[in-house]
Amino acid sequence: MKFGVVVFPGSNCDADCFHVLKNVFGRETVYIWHKEDNFDVDCIVLPGGFSYGDYLRAGAIARFSPVMKKVVEFANAGGLVIGICNGFQILLEAGLLPGAMLRNKSINFRCHDVYLRVENNNTPFTSKAHEGQVLKIPIAHGEGNYYCEPDTLKKLIANGQVVFRYCNSRGEVTEDANPNGSLYNIAGIINEKGNVLGMMPHPERCSENILGGEDGRVIWESIIAYLERGANRG
């Protein structure tokens, strides 16, 4: 089992993801530089940060980097891909997930803990959670206001592609619990095949008690369990 953490110019959460996978979970993990187009891993992590300075818009330039051609091929072949924060934005720009990110409704950068409700635990990324489980995970973004067309939203809901929604500590999905104005309180979605996840909150920042919480562990544990079953391809 081997994880690859992609490093773009401007990434700043790559080391966090690498640390959690390699040192907390003891899994073989390598960095993948944005210019690389030849690598062999079982799961690709697109980390948070400000790839290419977020010029034009978040993820717009990163999606044209050499590594993304390989990431798209990997995903289309059934490989697991998780995009966190800026990584989610890049997945949207690359067309691996539907929709787009807008500026936060408040126009402010938001950096604090939020609550997420697990809407679908029948995915490679949430199998160790239970449906309706509430997770406390931090966010740090200025463009996390997810948007898609009404027909796309209906399809996401019908297909179970909405994986996480912002909620309060009791698991109630409310407007007050939404930190950025995201449509339908969406915090994370998967593609139709179920092998590509994009989420705005940072599970790598709450996978050790020393950081104040471990709710993010369930996502990494789910991925590891899926890969251990040998079902990551096809």
Curated annotation (Swiss-Prot):
GO terms for biological process: 'de novo' IMP biosynthetic process. GO terms for cellular component: cytoplasm. Pfam families: GATase_5 (PF13507). One of its GO terms (molecular function) is ATP binding. It catalyses: N(2)-formyl-N(1)-(5-phospho-beta-D-ribosyl)glycinamide + L-glutamine + ATP + H2O = 2-formamido-N(1)-(5-O-phospho-beta-D-ribosyl)acetamidine + L-glutamate + ADP + phosphate + H(+); L-glutamine + H2O = L-glutamate + NH4(+). Pathway: Purine metabolism; IMP biosynthesis via de novo pathway; 5-amino-1-(5-phospho-D-ribosyl)imidazole from N(2)-formyl-N(1)-(5-phospho-D-ribosyl)glycinamide: step 1/2. It is found in: Cytoplasm. Its main location: cytoplasm. Keywords: ATP-binding, Cytoplasm, Glutamine amidotransferase, Hydrolase, Ligase, Nucleotide-binding, Purine biosynthesis. PROSITE patterns: GATASE_TYPE_1. Residues 3-233 form the Glutamine amidotransferase type-1 domain. The active site is at residues 85, 202, 204. Its EC number is 6.3.5.3, 3.5.1.2. Part of the FGAM synthase complex composed of 1 PurL, 1 PurQ and 2 PurS subunits. Part of the phosphoribosylformylglycinamidine synthase complex involved in the purines biosynthetic pathway. Catalyzes the ATP-dependent conversion of formylglycinamide ribonucleotide (FGAR) and glutamine to yield formylglycinamidine ribonucleotide (FGAM) and glutamate. The FGAM synthase complex is composed of three subunits. PurQ produces an ammonia molecule by converting glutamine to glutamate. PurL transfers the ammonia molecule to FGAR to form FGAM in an ATP-dependent manner. This is Phosphoribosylformylglycinamidine synthase subunit PurQ. It comes from Carboxydothermus hydrogenoformans (strain ATCC BAA-161 / DSM 6008 / Z-2901).
